Regions:
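Conserved, well-structured ligand/cofactor-binding cores
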Residues: 30-56, 97-102, 188, 305, ...
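Active-site phosphate/pyrophosphate-binding segments
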Residues: 28-35, 42, 50-54, 60, ...
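A generic structural motif
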Residues: 88-93, 248-259, 303-312
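Glycine-rich phosphate-binding loops that contact phosphosugars or nucleotide phosphates
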Residues: 53, 57-199, 217, 279-284, ...
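Short, small/acidic-rich helices and loops at N termini and domain boundaries
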Residues: 339-357
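Polybasic, low-complexity association/targeting segments
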Residues: 17-29
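C-terminal active-site/capping subdomain that shapes the small-molecule cofactor and substrate pocket
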Residues: 264, 269-344
Length: 357
C-alpha cells in the first residue's frame, strides 16, 4: 500500500530526476522563476509603498471584475472577504450584476489594462451611479479612466499578469485599507509566511526537501484538484498556472460536490492524478469528506497527493498556497522541457478579438 502520510504540505514524491539551476536558465526564457524568488520582497515593498489611499463612504456591496491573471487577484479578494458582512460579487465576463447601485464599489482589475471583458465592465460601470476604482499597469484602461474622470491607480507589471498577482494584491490592500475589512495583523502574518516558505521552495533550494519540486516531479499526467469551498481561488489559480506555465490540461472539483457525482468516474481505470487541496481549519464535515475520499483512493490503489494549507487567516492560507503551487507549475514546466513564459494560444485569441472589434 502506498504511504500517504503528510508533512506540512504533502507527501514526498518519487524521484524523477534532478532539477538544476542550469535547467531553469535554459528552459525559462524570460526568467519567470526569478520573479517568484522575489515574491516576498515584492509583496512587502508593495504594501509599504507610498500610495494615495482611497475612502469610499457607505459601501455595502463590492463587485470585483477581472479575467485571467487579473481574475486570480479578484478571486483572492473575494475569498478574503467571504466571511465579512459586505456583500461581494465576482465578475468573470462582460456584464455587471443588476444589483449595482450608489452604495456599490466596483473594483476593476486588468494588469495589462487592455482586457476586452474588463474594459466593457468599466464602461458599463461608468454609466451607472456607482463608485468605481480601476487598477492596471496602463493600457487602454488608464486612458479611459483619465478621459472619464474615474478613480485609477497605476501598478507596475512584473513579467506577466499571472506573476503580477503579488504586487497587485498587496498594493490594493494598501490603497483600499479603509474599505476592505482586513486586519493589518493578517496582512503582516501573510508577509511573514511568504518569507518563511521562500526558503523551502525558491530556486536556491533545488533539493529533494523542496515540496514544490516534489509535487512537480510527481505530476506526469492530467491532475484533478479536489478543493474545499474556501480554497476554490487556490485551486483555480493552480489550474490556470498549470495550463499557462506547463501547457497541460487540468480538472478541478469541489470536494463536497464530487461526492455526489465525480467520484463515480474512478470506477473506471484512469491515468488522471488526484491532488487533495485542504485547509487546516476546514469545516468538520468537509474534513470528513476528505477522509472518506482518501479511504476510497487507498482501497482502490489510486495514488494521490495531499496539499495542506498552513494555519492562520484566510489571506495567509491562500497567498502561501498560491506561492507554493505557482512554483510547482514552473518546476513542472522546466522538468518537462517547456518554457513557462510564452502563451501563444492566448496571444492568438487576443489578436482575433482585436481584429473583430
Amino acid at each position: 500500500m502506498t504511504d500517504h502520510s503528510v508533512d506540512r504540505y504533502f507527501i514526498t514524491s518519487r524521484k524523477l530526476g534532478i532539477l538544476m539551476i542550469s535547467d531553469l536558465e535554459k528552459y525559462d526564457s524570460q526568467k519567470m522563476y526569478k520573479i517568484y524568488d522575489d515574491w516576498p520582497k515584492i509583496a512587502r515593498e508593495s504594501y509599504e509603498s507610498e500610495q494615495e489611499l482611497i475612502d469610499f463612504q457607505n459601501i455595502d456591496h463590492i463587485v470585483f471584475a477581472g479575467m485571467g491573471g487579473s481574475g486570480a487577484i479578484v478571486d483572492l479578494f473575494s475569498s478574503i472577504l467571504s466571511k465579512s458582512d459586505i456583500h461581494v460579487s465576482l465578475i468573470k465576463g462582460y456584464l455587471l450584476p443588476k444589483t449595482v447601485d450608489k452604495n456599490t464599489l466596483v473594483i476593476i482589475t486588468s494588469v495589462s489594462g487592455n482586457t476586452d471583458e474588463t474594459l466593457t465592465v468599466l464602461n458599463s460601470a461608468k454609466k451607472i451611479k456607482c463608485n468605481v476604482i480601476a487598477f492596471s499597469s496602463g493600457g487602454k484602461m488608464e486612458k479611459f479612466c483619465y478621459n472619464n474622470k474615474i478613480t485609477f491607480r497605476k501598478i507596475p507589471k512584473f513579467h506577466s499578469p499571472r506573476t503580477s498577482l503579488i504586487n497587485f494584491t498587496y498594493t490594493i490592500l494598501k490603497i483600499l485599507n479603509s474599505i476592505l475589512p482586513i486586519e493589518k495583523k493578517d496582512i503582516m502574518d501573510s508577509l511573514s509566511e511568504l518569507d518563511r516558505i521562500k526558503k523551502e521552495i525558491d530556486s536556491n533550494n533545488l533539493s529533494d526537501s523542496n515540496p514544490a519540486i516534489n509535487l512537480a516531479k510527481w505530476l506526469s499526467n492530467i491532475p484533478i484538484i479536489y478543493y474545499p469551498h474556501g480554497l476554490e481561488p487556490v485551486a483555480t489559480r493552480f489550474k490556470s498556472s498549470l495550463q499557462e506555465n506547463a501547457k497541460t490540461h487540468v480538472i478541478t472539483e469541489d470536494v463536497i460536490e464530487s461526492c455526489h457525482n465525480g467520484i463515480v468516474s474512478w470506477e473506471r481505470s484512469s491515468e488522471v492524478q488526484p491532488i487533495l487541496l485542504q485547509g487546516k481549519d476546514d469545516y468538520i464535515k468537509t474534513k470528513e469528506r476528505f477522509t472518506i475520499i482518501k479511504k476510497f483512493f487507498i482501497k482502490n490503489n489510486i495514488d494521490f497527493k495531499e496539499v495542506n494549507s498552513v494555519s492562520g487567516n484566510i489571506l495567509t492560507k491562500t497567498i502561501s498556497l498560491m506561492y507554493l503551487l505557482d512554483y510547482t507549475t514552473i518546476y513542472h514546466a522546466v522538468l518537462s522541457k517547456i518554457d513557462p513564459s510564452p502563451v501563444n494560444a492566448i496571444d492568438f485569441i487576443k489578436k482575433e478579438i482585436s481584429e473583430n472589434n
